[in-house]
Structures are given as C-alpha cells and as structure tokens.
C-alpha cells in the first residue's frame, strides 16, 4: 500500500512538472491535422502511436526545460515553488525521465512511418533547443510557438508520410497563437528578465509594445484561421468556431493585468485552452456533420 502511494505521488509530481494539462495547446490541432490528412478517422495504429509520440515529445521537452531553467526558476519568486528549485525531484532523475521519453518518441515515430522516424532526431533538437533561446534572443516566444507547431505538422506526416501545404498553415496558426500568449505570460517577468539578462519581447520593448505585438500575432492567426475556410472548403460550423475564438482572444487581451497572477493565468492559459477546444470541436463537427 505504501509503495503504491509513493508511485502515485511520483506520477503526480511528474505530471505537474511537465504541465500535462497544457497538452490542450497542441493536441487539438494535431487531431484536426490527422482528420484532414486521413480525410476521415485515421487508423487506430496511427492514432495510438501518434498520441504516444506527441505526449512523449512534449513530456521530454518540458522536463528538459525545467532542468535547464532551474537556476533562474529558483531566483524568480513566481517560479521558486517549482519542483526542482524546491528539490521535490532531483535533476538526474528528471534527466532520465527526459531520455526515456525521447526514446519512446523515436520508437513511436518509427512505428508510424519512415519520414517520421527520419525527422525524429531533428524534432528532438528543435523542442530541446528552445530552453536556451531566452538567453540570447527576444524571438524566443516565436521559437516556442515554432516547436509546438510541430504537433499538427508531425500529425499530418504520421498519417500520410508526405509533405503538404495545409499542415504548415495549421502549424503557423499554432506558432503565432502560442507566441502571442507567451508574450502576454512573459509580461509578468519584465523586471526579472532585465535584471538577469534574459530576453523577451516585453523586457526589450516594454509592456505596452509587447502587448501590441501579441495582438498583431493573434490578428494574423485569425486571418489564417479564416484563410482555411476556402482552402479546406469549410462550412458554417467552423465559421462559428472561429467567431467564438475571436471573442475569446479579444477577452484575453482585454483582461490582461500583469500584477495579478490569477488574471494572467486565465488570460495566458485558461482562455487559450478553451480556444483550442472550440476550434477542435467546430472543425470536427464541420467535417463530419456537413
């Protein structure tokens, strides 16, 4: 009984470490990409190994990021409670977790098709290198978005084993969306970033300009969501989903308050998790019902 409790505690700690709930940012777009690529429901083989690959890749990347950033996390009052600064988990233990997840990712990619397997090392480099970008460029927000954009692109490859135009539009949408709300989230750390030599758009250009840039990125994201209507011949259900997403994005930018962690969590995470689900549900209903 005690052993089972320890295992449960460890699973909970690792789930918190990699922010498992944040899978909602990438998974919905990966599902859309799979459905469009398959022109329907993909095979169980593709769905199973595609999901395993996605979860393993993001678990490894998030855990690696926590190891790389732990010294900064320990100095930042906002992040000092995280697992590594508080020594709830050991660095070596987390690095083994990273290695295991990346190994699972490569194996899952190989189970999908040759293209996914060949690209898997490049994908690992991409998602791991993000952890260092904030040390030398304010474009780290876009790079983060770029890494998460690999989810819908990789999902398309998983189904077809071929390059195409549509997944790169989906990937660009994800990149701009993620970068925009990461800028909003980063506005909480302007002074900390400036004092410790970390680069971010808010710390370099200031709060107001940073939020303007985030708004521009989200505006372009919306235009690309609209562009998918004629490209994919989407119907009114998808259009309604886009309209709801626009309202949620406007709400997100309206309520921004860097001094309030609770409000910033809603603006940066909660509303965007709803947006991803709205787009997923509207795209799926549009495809299967119309």
Language-model regions: role of each:
Residues 1-12, 62-89, 183-208, 255-264:
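Cytosolic, membrane-interface loops and tails of multi-pass inner-membrane proteins
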Residues 18, 69, 90, 140, ...:
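Residue-level signal for inorganic ion chemistry
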Residues 27-33, 83, 144-159, 204, ...:
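Small-residue-rich segments of transmembrane alpha-helices in multi-pass membrane proteins
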Residues 29-32, 36-68, 78, 102-110, ...:
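Membrane-embedded alpha-helical segments that form the functional core of polytopic membrane enzymes
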Residues 48, 52, 70-120, 195-240, ...:
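Multi-pass membrane catalytic core of lipid/isoprenoid biosynthesis enzymes
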Residues 9, 227-290:
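Extended hydrophobic alpha-helices typical of membrane-associated regions
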Residues 27, 106, 128-131, 152, ...:
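Hydrophobic transmembrane alpha-helices of multi-pass small-molecule transporters
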Residues 7-16, 82-170, 250-257:
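Intramembrane alpha-helical segments
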């Amino acid at each position: 009984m005690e052993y089972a409790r320890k295992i449960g505690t460890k699973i909970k700690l690792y789930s918190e470490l990699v922010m498992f709930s944040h899978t909602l940012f990438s998974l919905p777009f990966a599902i859309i990409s799979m459905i469009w690529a398959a022109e329907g429901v993909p095979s169980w083989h593709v769905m199973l190994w595609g999901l395993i690959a996605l979860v393993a890749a993001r678990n490894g990347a998030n855990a690696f990021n926590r190891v790389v950033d732990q010294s900064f996390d320990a100095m930042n009052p906002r992040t000092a409670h995280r697992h590594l600064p508080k020594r709830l988990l050991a660095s070596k233990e987390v690095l083994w977790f990273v290695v295991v997840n990346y190994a699972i990712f490569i194996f899952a990619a190989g189970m999908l098709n040759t293209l996914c397997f060949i690209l898997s090392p490049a994908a690992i480099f991409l998602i791991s290198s993000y952890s260092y970008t904030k040390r030398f460029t304010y474009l780290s927000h876009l790079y983060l978005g770029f890494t998460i954009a690999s989810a819908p692109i990789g999902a398309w490859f998983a189904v077809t084993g071929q390059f195409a135009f549509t997944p790169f539009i989906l990937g660009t949408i994800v990149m701009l969306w993620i970068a925009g709300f990461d800028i909003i989230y980063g506005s909480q750390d302007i002074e900390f970033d400036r004092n410790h030599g970390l680069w971010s758009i808010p710390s370099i250009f200031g709060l107001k300009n940073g939020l303007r840039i985030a708004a521009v990125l989200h505006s372009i994201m919306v235009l690309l969501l609209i562009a998918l209507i004629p490209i994919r011949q989407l119907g009114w259900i998808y259009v309604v989903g886009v309209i709801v997403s626009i309202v949620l994005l406007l709400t997100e930018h309206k309520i921004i308050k860097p001094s309030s962690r609770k409000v910033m969590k809603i603006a940066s995470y909660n509303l965007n998790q709803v947006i991803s689900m709205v787009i997923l549900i509207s795209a799926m209903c549009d495809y299967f019902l119309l």
